[in-house]
Amino acid sequence: MMNSQFEKMGSNLIQVMTYGRGTGGTRDVDVEDLYELVDKYPQYLTGVTPYVSASAKVRYQTDDYDRTSVYGVSEAFFKEDTKGTMQGETLAEGRFLSYIDVDRHQNVCVIGDYLAQTAFRGDALGKTISLSGVPYTVIGVLSKSGDSSEGSADDVIYIPYENAQRMGTGTMMMGTDEMFLLTATSRDTASAAKGIVEKRLYKTYQSSDYYMVMT
């Protein structure tokens, strides 16, 4: 599922994975550090979000959805200028997560087409789905992007990232500790933006062994 999600990435999207504390300091790079980069280099970077794979038991009424992927993101994951997510997904109905949803850790979610059709029979908005026993209200439904099969890129739920962190993390790519997504201002600036991010990570970790940056 993770691989199918990232197949949709545009070339102006930057994926950051960290593997733990380096030798250059007493802490890891966190999302606040990356927010500072976006503010400092607006000509190269336009947004950043944590990307948390949550370990959550998904249930609607009496049915379990064991292959549904649950990810925690911030409101920046949805790009107002393109009306889509950083990964190219678009909304079929409803809305995406807002700053207030994320800041207040609201129990709301955006679901993919598979759950919308299979669990809710096309009538998902305003309904609730259980994530590890906690009811989440569906505020948005993504447009179909593939074959809408179980376990596919359409079988996904997005929630506020701190909610996902509290659930415990699921299987991330390559055993990473943390993962972030950033967007460059364009394909032409993506390489320079990647270099800016790498330089900031190296400042903290003092070794490229502790992180990976990909476009």
Where are these regions (language model features)?
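Mechanotransmission and gating elements of multispan inner-membrane complexes involved in transport
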Residues: 27-29, 39-44, 130-135, 141-215
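Short aromatic/hydrophobic contact patches that present stacked aromatics
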Residues: 15, 108, 179-181
